[in-house]
């Protein structure tokens, strides 16, 4: 277990907490706006952009999705079913053809009506253009081009190059924008159809939204919303406690109480991605040894305060393709040492420095988790150095093209499959040429391609087998934990977070608490 590292890490945590409490007392944490008519939200970081075609990025989508802009349809986080939004109905009319009926009476924030021409434009801009939108590559294959056919103002037909049983699910990630939106550059402040419109964005300070009084759906309770960002979790928690914020994302367990927060399951799974192109990580014995060297139960119980469970695959239960037969690898440092010795005897340079790259504020106690991993890998004979990075620097390691000349990298990732289907994970993280995969095998690529064309139980079984193959024959990932989130919430508001909250926090679902109402 983590007995020795626990005491060391907890001692570090105590120092951090002491420092954090001093920071709370002496740093400006407020300025989230006045209570009452404005919903006040404090984030961990400022969004890099509000461009709708980047809304599948968590830091953008948490503000944009279904607040400022909307897709044709959206996935119910509780049931996994698709429900109507800007499309009222959809159907597959041929193996490679889907038809959508669009909602009438919808206007953009600029007063222009939403029509099928706008829907076709939005899909073409996000998927078929050269803008390099995150949705193109994450949700759609980079090489996939969709055929788009407008049928009057309220009908849209989408043609795919091959049968795609989950096209409607993919389109739930494409936000609708007016057809006057630039096709040559991404926009910073978009125009959408959502319940809120952008009033102002003061860089480095705040984003203010105002209620869309012409919204086609039910009007949200709050006339305005204001986002600020504070990197320290203790500061975010203090803003809830002092009545300076109504909602606060990603609190640390030590800052959370029953009065100021609620725990919820999110879509996130933490893992180490091992670059199998560089020695010693190019040897599967070393990669499997790392999996055996990690004490998942100790990390979950001590550092993550029980707000997680050990993971054996990149997706949690509830996502199509989850394999219930896979169990997290048992903590076995002796077996790990034996594999390292065997590799060394065959000439593998097991003493070569491995850089463990982790992102600041990635999840609570991420730095301490990185230290625990470094310690555990050192105990089995590996030389690991930690590199903490900000979001931009971490993305350079996470997305292709990867940095060159940096040696073997073990990247601490946190993957959230908010779409509910394993295709979005395997195409990104397991395919040899995937945008977030460092290597793979032709055999696994073929299985991923075949599974993508299946539906129903056959699809479930095919993807479940792929995750087993990853563990047995590839081992690019050492899975750590399926995470739970802690959302700070003021007694003055009512909001029920779900597994999608970390990716898209719907402001229209928040309402003021009634007098005397229990949480």
Question: Where are the regions that the model predicts?
Answer:
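N-terminal lobe/hinge region of extracytoplasmic solute-binding protein
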Residues: 42-94, 191-192
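Surface-exposed binding/hinge segments that line
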Residues: 91, 101, 135-180
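Ligand-site clamp/hinge motif
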Residues: 184, 212-256, 383
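Long beta-strand-rich cores associated with HINT superfamily self-processing modules
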Residues: 487-519
């Amino acid at each position: 277990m983590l007995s020795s590292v626990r005491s060391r890490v907890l001692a570090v945590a105590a120092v951090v907490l002491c420092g954090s409490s001093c920071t709370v007392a002496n740093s400006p944490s407020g300025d989230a706006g006045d209570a009452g008519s404005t919903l006040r939200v404090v984030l961990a970081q400022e969004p890099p952009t509000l461009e709708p075609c980047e809304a599948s990025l968590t830091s953008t989508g948490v503000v944009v999705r279904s607040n400022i802009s909307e897709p044709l349809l959206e996935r119910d986080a509780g049931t996994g079913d698709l429900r109507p939004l800007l499309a009222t109905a959809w159907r597959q009319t041929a193996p490679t053809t889907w038809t959508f009926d669009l909602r009438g009476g919808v206007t953009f924030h600029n007063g222009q009506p939403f029509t099928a021409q706008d829907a076709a434009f939005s899909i073409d801009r996000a998927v078929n253009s050269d803008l390099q939108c995150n949705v193109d590559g994450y949700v759609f294959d980079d090489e996939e081009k969709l055929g788009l056919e407008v049928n009057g103002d309220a009908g849209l037909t989408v043609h795919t190059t091959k049968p795609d049983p989950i096209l409607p699910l993919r389109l739930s990630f494409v936000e609708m924008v007016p057809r006057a939106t630039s096709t040559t550059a991404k926009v910073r402040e978009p125009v959408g159809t959502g319940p809120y419109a952008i009033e102002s964005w003061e860089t480095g300070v705040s984003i203010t939204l105002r209620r869309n009084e012409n919204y086609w759906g039910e009007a949200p309770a709050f006339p305005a919303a204001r986002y600020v960002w504070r990197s320290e979790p203790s500061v975010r928690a203090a803003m809830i406690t002092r009545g300076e914020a109504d909602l606060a994302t990603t609190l640390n367990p030590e800052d959370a109480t029953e009065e100021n927060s609620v725990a919820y399951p999110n879509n996130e799974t933490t893992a180490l991605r091992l670059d199998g192109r560089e020695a010693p990580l190019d040897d599967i014995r070393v990669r499997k040894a790392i999996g055996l060297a990690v004490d998942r139960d100790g990390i979950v119980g001590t550092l993550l305060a029980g707000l997680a469970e050990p993971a054996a695959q990149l997706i949690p239960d509830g996502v199509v393709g989850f394999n219930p037969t896979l169990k997290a690898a048992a903590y076995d440092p002796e077996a790990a040492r034996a594999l390292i010795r065997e590799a060394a005897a065959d000439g593998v340079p097991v003493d070569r420095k491995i850089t463990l790259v982790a992102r600041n504020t990635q999840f609570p106690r991420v730095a301490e988790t990185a230290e625990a991993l470094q310690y555990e890998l050192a105990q089995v004979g590996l030389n690991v150095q930690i590199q903490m990075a900000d979001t931009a620097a971490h993305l350079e390691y996470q997305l292709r093209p990867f940095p060159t000349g940096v040696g073997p990298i073990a990247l601490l990732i946190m993957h959230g499959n908010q779409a509910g289907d394993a295709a979005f994970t395997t195409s990104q993280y397991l395919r040899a040429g995937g945008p977030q995969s460092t290597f793979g095998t032709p055999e696994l690529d073929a299985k991923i391609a075949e599974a993508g064309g299946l539906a129903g139980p056959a699809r479930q079984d095919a993807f479940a087998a792929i995750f087993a193959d990853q563990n047995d024959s590839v081992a690019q990932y050492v899975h750590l934990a399926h995470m739970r989130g802690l959302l700070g919430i003021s007694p003055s508001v009512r909001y029920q977070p779900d597994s999608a909250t970390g990716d898209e926090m719907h402001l229209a679902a928040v309402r003021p608490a009634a007098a005397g109402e229990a949480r």
